[in-house]
From Swiss-Prot:
Job description of the protein: Neuronal cell surface protein that may be involved in cell recognition and cell adhesion.
Subunit note: Interacts (via cytoplasmic C-terminal region) with CASK. Isoform Beta 4b binds alpha-dystroglycan and neuroligins NLGN1, NLGN2 and NLGN3. Interacts with CBLN1, CBLN2 and, less avidly, with CBLN4. Interacts with CLSTN3.
Gene that specifies this protein: Nrxn2
Tissues of expression: Brain (neuronal synapse).
Topology in membrane: Single-pass type I membrane protein
Laminin G-like domain span: 87-295
Family, per entry: Belongs to the neurexin family.
Region (Disordered): 1-27, 408-458, 476-496, 530-557, 629-662
Species of origin: Rattus norvegicus
Protein name listed in UniProt: Neurexin-2-beta
Amino acid sequence: MPPGGSGQGGCPRRPPALAGPLPPPPPPPPLPLLLGLLLLLGAAEGARVSSSLSTTHHVHHFHSKHGTVPIAINRMPFLTRSGHAGTTYIFGKGGALITYTWPPNDRPSTRMDRLAVGFSTHQRSAVLVRVDSASGLGDYLQLHIDQGTVGVIFNVGTDDITIDEPNAIVSDGKYHVVRFTRSGGNATLQVDSWPVNERYPAGNFDNERLAIARQRIPYRLGRVVDEWLLDKGRQLTIFNSQAAIKIGGRDQGRPFQGQVSGLYYNGLKVLALAAESDPNVRTEGHLRLVGEGPSVLLSAETTATTLLADMATTIMETTTTMATTTTRRGRSPTMRDSTTQNTDDLLVASAECPSDDEDLEECEPSTGGELILPIITEDSLDPPPVATRSPFVPPPPTFYPFLTGVGATQDTLPPPAARRPSSGGPCQAERDDSDCEEPVEASGFASGEVFDSSLPPTDDEDFYTTFPLVTDRTTLLSPRKPAPRPNLRTDGATGAPGVLLAPSAPAPNLPAGKMNHRDPLQPLLENPPLGPGVPTAFEPRRPPPLRPGVTSVPGFPRLPTANPTGPGERGPPGAVEVIRESSSTTGMVVGIVAAAALCILILLYAMYKYRNRDEGSYQVDQSRNYISNSAQSNGAVVKEKAPAAPKTPSKAKKNKDKEYYV
């Protein structure tokens, strides 16, 4: 068979094998190298879209079939993306208005404000947001568009302060994000990724020097100096009694046309509240709700789900973490700000008039409101370090938890005017519990005096005879739905001593500094022994047949307790006030009496010594007269020696002897 032919079925002959092994195929690139390349690409993409505000990249992961790949995500792409950012409303050509109104008792007065909003429009002049104070005060804040640029104007009592961004044109129909912050008279404004504009009024530079100089100004001249500084134009800092937020500018004659998304003001999501038909929000005009999406402001501890531009089938969870609210300028509030207002920003959570601002002369406080209690702890099973043991006296037929502070005496009970008879009251056994809950409140800010709208005026001297001088005011709130608690232990407050622990049941809002005693107050303590380290234990027992007892200390006489309901009759259960024992009152009285007695003794002793000193002087004068009379027994001698009369007796005797011998 010739070479190269087919043999055995025509199979072609295999070429002869070459000497030596074949080279191996090239190895695939290592997996760490691929991961490193993807990481660099992701970091470059994140750096490309970063802005001046974003100084930190947060590494996040997305999962795929090839493993976990870290990607650097920046928070700015979400703010500059043209999609929906929070609840979005479209304002039509006819104009529209969304108004959020604070209740009269919950109007805040703030020293710092934060505003953030996203919008798109083709208008060159319009009003987006305006915040007004109560009528008569004149404080306001307004975000507007003027000549296609964004500006803010506000007034907190002195002059109008303006800040704008002339370089950013926002009337191009694109989506823009505006952030505004105010601290006193200072303000910052940022549009999209443009640098932050800062505004510092000239009047604020003197505040530090004023604070230093005020320490040397006499107290009686403080008000005069303040009035003089006010006349000189010192910048005020508090936005007083904010009443309403208005979005749309229809009431200002410059209506906005376009879309507004995810508006935040001091933690309030006004557009979200409008979409939820909140009773405090009113809408009018040509307004249409678009929907909700990712939030405008990526805040702390929030997770946003978004679609990557280069991976349409991959969902990545992103979490953006921010630093504290005071280290960066011009950034938006966090989620904690949207739920709980910071205590340094919120000065007064009511319609009361702040005392550190001068433009509140026409402000009239109203009743009711919310009182912020800085030291309130919930029920706990741990015993307090120092407490008193007192029996629990519940009203039949249910048991109420009774919480005490640190000590109580009979002189700390409320006056008779603070309690009312149970007959005809709203809190009967057959009435609903909701009609009976009017809790007494505690305040860590006040001077320790209890106020009641039903009591006589505080300038009455007789009114204060039943109140001790105490430092802290403590109260007890009655629960809305009482549950049997036969054995209850409470944890001591972590703040100032004497602050009472309040149950976790919500209480009605009352204004700061106001007390509301509408339930009759009954003492529920009976002879507890005092001693450190003794935990508070409560045991259920039936009320005594006679009048309720009061706490007494060994060595002190028992004083009658004011009981308007009469002996053997108890008022309805309600708020009970317990104030810590103040032994300094008794010591002060004893000290005053002792000091008065000592002063009287010193005065009597001084009078006695002065009287004795006068009698001695009189005797000395008599002795001198006696010597002079003895010298006058010889008339001739007196005539001859008249100038020698005031001389000493020895000299006179010597002259007499000499004359005798002559």
